[in-house]
Amino acid sequence: MRALGIILAGGNSNKLGDLSAKRAVAAMPITGSYRAIDFALSNMTNSHIQKVAVFTQYNTRSLNEHLNSSKWWDFGRKQGGLFIFTPTITAANSYWYKGTADALYQNIKFLKESHEPYVVIASGDGIYKLDYNKVLEEHISNGADITVVCKDMAPGEDDINRFGVIKMNEDGRIIDFEEKPLVAGTNTVSIGVYVIRRRQLIELLETCANEGRNDFVRDILVRYKGCLLYTSDAADEL
């Protein structure tokens, strides 16, 4: 297996109001018996990623109950599996995840003990169908440090400022990344799917932790200008 998967499913969305008062956004019902997270899980297994970690935090009960039926996604193989990580309160750690990078760092042992050379990171509440293998192939072909899956929004869409807005050159390299700007400079947005080498992710997370930084987008994608960031147009198939 070339990549392991990580699904970030711990966030709370105040925009959903009462809908998310007792349920994680990733556990929201979609067309009956499905949950929002099923799309990311299905994309993982359909892309032959058989080792997947889900990071949960907010209103985890219904989400964890749903994830316990992992046989639905065929993650039960000998060298794979579905792993669920929630914040662990210990003598050395007395707080919940302080951000997406902190969630990854608190579980860095999982990354260090894995052997896959690449990591695919996805949001647990994205509703889409996507072949992560195509993104991985583009990542390797470009020699990228980090690949960000993006999509062009229709000009003038009201909710474009809910996303990370990307400016890129003609080769697809990211030259500017602004998280949830008040005024968007382009209509190209990140859909919250990233590919990165596992060892490089570990190094960046350790640097962030040493500097007291906790957010994957703000403190890694936006801050580390030395990284070769490229876009993938795989999301155009959505």
Residue ranges of predicted features:
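Conserved N-terminal catalytic core of the sugar/cofactor nucleotidyltransferase
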Residues: 1-8, 12-15, 19-21, 25, ...
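Conserved core of the sugar-phosphate nucleotidyltransferase
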Residues: 129-199, 203-211
